[in-house]
Amino acid sequence: MWDMQCDLIEEEAAEFLEAADECFADPENIDRRTDLIKELSDLVFVCYQFAAAFNLDLDKAMSLVFESNMSKLDEQGKPIFRPDGKVLKGPNYQPPDLMSCVPAVHLNHYDTNGK
C-alpha cells in the first residue's frame, strides 16, 4: 500500500507541475487555469488519501502548520524574506507540534514494503 500511495502522489505531482508550466506560459488562458486547479485538487486529494490510509490527521496537521507559519512574522506582523522570496522564521517562530496527528503504531505492523 505504501508504494502505491507514494506512486499516486508522484504521478499527481508531475501532472500538477506540467499544468503549472502550461498555465504560467499562458496565464490568461481560462482552460489552462482550470486544468491547473484540477491537477492541484487531484494532488491534494491523493495526499489526503495517503493520510487516511495511514491514519494520519492531515486536517489537524495543516492547521498546526498554518499556525506555525504565521508565527514566522516579525514584531510588526510582516514576513521576513530571503533574497529569493522565501519567508524566513521570525523572532516569534514556534515549530508545529505534530505528535498529536500521528497515532502510535508498532513498526512491525507494516512489512518492509510498507504493506
PLM features per residue range, with description:
Residues 1-40, 44-115:
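Flexible "arm" and connector segments at domain edges
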